[in-house]
Structure formats: structure tokens, C-alpha cells
Amino acid sequence: MTNRDAAADETIEARLAREDDREAVLAFCARTWDDGDYIQYVWEDWLRDSSGALLVATLAGRPVGLAHLRMMSPEEAWIEGVRVDPEARRRGVARVLISRAARL
């Protein structure tokens, strides 16, 4: 799933997370909440979760968003841990992540 950012003329893409996304994702997650974030504690579990998918959104190749999809049953899914880098907000990053998750 992609979304064109007309102002910056850059494409937002959503894909499955990779281990090498960890550092960049945790960096923007640390800037998301004033009191810290739990993503650093669940990253490895979510990355290996066979009952769902960990998605990363990128802008100009740089991770700027995160969402975890967990399949609760064949008909029901749960989306959790949605995060968007504060510097990339208001560009449709979460929309791209949710749309990609809905197609899985």
C-alpha cells in the first residue's frame, strides 16, 4: 500500500517489518509518548508473531510508522501499537498502515 505525499512528492509504503528496522522504529517510538513506550519490550515477540504481522511504514526509505496486526480468529483481527513518527504526522502514514493490515 502506498500514499503519495504531494507536498513532499514522496511515497509512503507499508511492508512487513524487518529486524534491521528496530533501531529507527524504537527511536521514533521514544519520541511518541512523554512517559516512554512499551514497543521496545514487545518488538521481538511481534516480529516473530506467527498469528499476525508487524508492519512498518516508510517515507523516502526511512521507517516512520508501525502497526501490529494480530489475528484473533479467521474472521477477527486486532490492530495494536500504531505509532507514527512525530515528524511524519498528517501525511497519511497511519492510513497506509491500516489499509495494508486490512489486506492481510
PLM regions and their residue ranges:
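Conserved beta-strand in the GNAT
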Residues: V56, R62-R70, W78-R83
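Conserved acetyl-CoA-binding loop-helix of GNAT-fold acetyltransferases
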Residues: G81-P86, R90-L104
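Alpha-helical elements of Rossmann-like donor-binding domains used by nucleotide-donor carbohydrate transfer enzymes
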Residues: A24-F28, R62, V96, R100
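A generic structural signal for beta-strand entry/edge sites
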Residues: G52, P74-E76
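Short, low-complexity Ser/Thr-rich regulatory SLiMs
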Residues: R18, M71-S73, P86
